[in-house]
Amino acid sequence: MKRINRRKFIVQAGAAAAATGLPTAPAEAQVGRKLGTCGPPPRKNPTRQTSAEGMPPLPLPAVPLRRSEPKAEPAPPLMIAKLEYGTTQDWNTDPGDIDNLMRHVRSAVGLWYGWKQMPLAELVALYQAKKESKVPALYLSGHEAFQFTPQERAALTQYLLDGGSLLADACCGRSEFANSFRAEVKAMFPRRSLDRLELDHPVFRSFHKYTTVNFRTFKGATRVDTVGPPELYGMNLGCRAAILFSPWDLSCGWDEHSHEHGQRLLPGDAIRLGINLVSYIAALRQVAEVQSVTREVSGKNERKRQQFVLAQLRHHGDWDPDPNSTAQLLRTIASVSSLAVAFDQKPVDAKETDIARFPFLYMTGFRDPRFSGEELGALRRHLQAGGFLFVNNCSGYAAFDRHIRDMVSKLFPDQKLERLGAEHRLFRSFYTLTEGRDRQSGAARPLELEGVRIRDRVVLVYSKNDAVTHLKLVSDPFGNGYDADTCSKLVTNVVSYAMQN
């Protein structure tokens, strides 16, 4: 195959990182290309010169000359592995995409990350040998439809559960790849969904703050440029989006070229969004590793009939994003109070027969819970009959806050959430609380709890700021919430108030 000069390719294509419009790739770059490739090869890694003393083959008294030998730069920490899958070159549609993206990350963020190509068979062999891959992220791209084997699905599933991330891009916006990827995600995680990320998701503010991007599509021979909110899809495991997918082409933009077909982000936006994706994965790496291990908390099985039982509501909005922090909530209650605690958590559906036995209900999540009218009726009757519901906004995102307010308006149409004043009994039920601390800055911040009253009793307490996940001292770095000490005291007071009233 004729070797493509990268500089010539880019000049002829008229590409640049901040470009807003690009013509078709040159014809000579299309000729003789292996199946699946639509971009030039990656640039050669740079070398540096290091001096070394040497004696030239000259008779004395010649002055010794200094000669230099090339030496490669030390390898940066590995961030992404580009997956080799299938039987064609379709996995490598843009050979220079990740290499170029890492250069932009280094330039913009000041952090140098490495990448490598990795056969999917290597990942399968690793997990079949009961080992783990320590690569933070795997990258998948292509044009054509594909299908994983059961062994490949099992390895990828375990990799994600172990704290890894999967980043996927439909090159040129090809629906064949997009549909196959969605089907594979569904096969790996049948009970979870790949949902469009809300604009307040941290991936859109992890480095560059995004509200709109530039899209390019083609209707026949007509080019259509539009501006709109970015479109990324994610699937959560714990408090992070472990799978991130773009149905709009990013890889051609990372590779600094474009084509007059398909659907894509313009290269400038593709590169900036790519920097955000890498920044998000890097920032959530510690959280991913902590949440990959679920800890069981147990205690003496004393006073069983008097034990406090926490029943967690199941719903459609990612109802159990962080099992470790829920277990830590129970551990906190047991360690600071004399309350007998049942450590076996009880997941329950919002059905009258399921929740009737549990006076204290706990709810958290990320997305719209989508309770049915029948489920809302069961919850309403339960709270009117003496039950209690504590709702915590996991990570404190605005999207879940909107959904909870909508849920409460349907649950109690004649009432609304009201801010609990500083004099409310809840803030004195165990600890005397006047203010909290922010988990990011450590600065003082008000305790913002809201509730719904029935007569003189608050039956529903809602914290729009995360009051639970930082109990384990590691939480979403982009989250909005209280520090560990405030979380501990606040949840203790909520439980104490519920038990006393």
Positions of predicted regions on the chain:
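N-terminal secretory signal peptides and thylakoid transit peptides that target proteins
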Residues: 1-17
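Sec/Tat signal peptide C-region and signal peptidase I cleavage site
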Residues: 25-28
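An acidic, glycine-rich "communication" segment
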Residues: 76, 177-257, 264-275, 306-309, ...
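Loop/turn elements at helix/coil->beta-strand transitions in domains of secreted/extracellular proteins
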Residues: 78, 133-136, 162-165, 239-241, ...
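Extracytoplasmic/secreted envelope proteins and their assembly/folding machinery
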Residues: 95-102, 153, 157, 178-182, ...
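Surface-exposed patches in mature extracellular/periplasmic domains of secreted proteins
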Residues: 112-121, 169-171, 192-198, 288-293, ...
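Short alpha-beta junction capping motif
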Residues: 137-178, 360-401
